[in-house]
Amino acid sequence: EFLKQHPDSVYRSYVWGFVCHYSLDSTAHPYINWLAEKLAKQRPWETASTMHGEIESALDAIVLRYETGKLPSEVALKAMFPKNEAVERKIAHLYRQILFSLYGDDVSEESLVQAMNDAHGVFSLVTDRTGLKKKLFERIERGKPSAIASHIVPLTENDQIDYANIQNAPWGDGDSHQSFFELYGEAQGVAGKILGEFLEGDLALL
């Protein structure tokens, strides 16, 4: 309804991106959650949550290399989240309407803009061009859950762990064998279906 009432390319592109994110999460999270539990059992000081962060950070590096041929050291994360006040205010307006419509929460647009600015700052802080930040926090958090280190994208992933399941090893209940890249491809199909029916279709059937 919001997009019908606000035919603006900023709103549309943001929502399209959100749908793509949702599609990948819903498709890949069963595998990621399973692997996170497995790694947490192997490292008693960690939690499934921190291992989830480590897996997604490793996959960020893997997908970046796959899609662009670049290493994380060549990318400033905050550039993935550029500051643009006009765009931020439109996104804040979108979220304000959604939060009120779905939950009855009257959140100010200023608070939502501040949340985006905070996120931009976090992206800047976890950009690690040399690998030294990750090593520092790994040392600080040694023997404890890696709440910070696990969210810093590594220059290259730990080659002792097949994060993307390239070997198609069984996972979950043992009947699943898809690699992350196969799930990635499935997610593109899910996103295409949602977006193809977004304004008119019954998304509850997806």
Region locations from a protein language model:
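N-terminal leader/auxiliary helical segments
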Residues: 1-17, 22-206
